[in-house]
A protein has these predicted regions:
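Conserved histidines in hydrophobic membrane contexts and catalytic metal-binding motifs
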Residues: 1-170
Length: 170
């Protein structure tokens, strides 16, 4: 005769094997993605940082004017200037129609010169897409990863229930 705990154990095992394999993939891709800034900084030393100068850094409005004077016609949506000396500024352009995010470029905060594009950025965009949406279109992958997160929560709770001793220690 099957008891409730035996049936629950079988369900726990089945869901754990099924969802667990995909959850491992999500976890590993998340671990890789968590280091994307450090790896990109290491791969692109001339893009993420600039040589320190005695001159003052440009103000955000002067930086935007310098970038647009270099021939850039797209609308600048956001400028990120770091307080850390020698760190390049980031400019995010407005998203094109049909895109969720605009392109990000780096600029020298002293001159406004646009710096070369980062190498390795496409790889980390792929890793992020794997982690968040399992390389599926966003509207298809988001409910799947949400369901897997719910399965992880249920597996954790059912694992506690299954592991809990039948008789407490006296």
């Amino acid at each position: 005769m099957w008891s409730f705990k035996k049936i629950w154990f079988q369900l726990h095992w089945l869901i754990g094997i099924s969802a667990g394999t995909v959850l491992v993939l999500i976890g590993l891709s998340g671990a890789v993605f968590s280091f994307h800034e450090e790896v990109l900084d290491w791969l692109n030393p001339g893009t993420s940082s600039v040589t320190l100068r005695d001159a003052p850094e440009l103000s955000p409005s002067a930086l935007a004017q310098a970038v647009q004077a270099s021939g850039e016609t797209r609308r600048i949506d956001r400028i990120t200037v770091y307080s850390e000396p020698g760190k390049s500024a980031q400019l995010t352009f407005a998203a094109e129609p049909g895109q969720r995010r605009g392109e990000v470029v780096f600029a020298d905060p002293y001159t406004g010169k646009v710096l070369p594009e980062q190498k390795g950025k496409d790889f980390f965009e792929w890793v992020e897409s794997l982690h968040r949406w399992l390389l599926l279109p966003r509207d298809d992958g988001k409910p799947i990863t949400g369901t897997l997160a719910f399965c992880l929560l249920m597996l954790s709770l059912s694992g506690l229930y299954l592991r809990w001793p039948a008789k407490p220690l006296s």
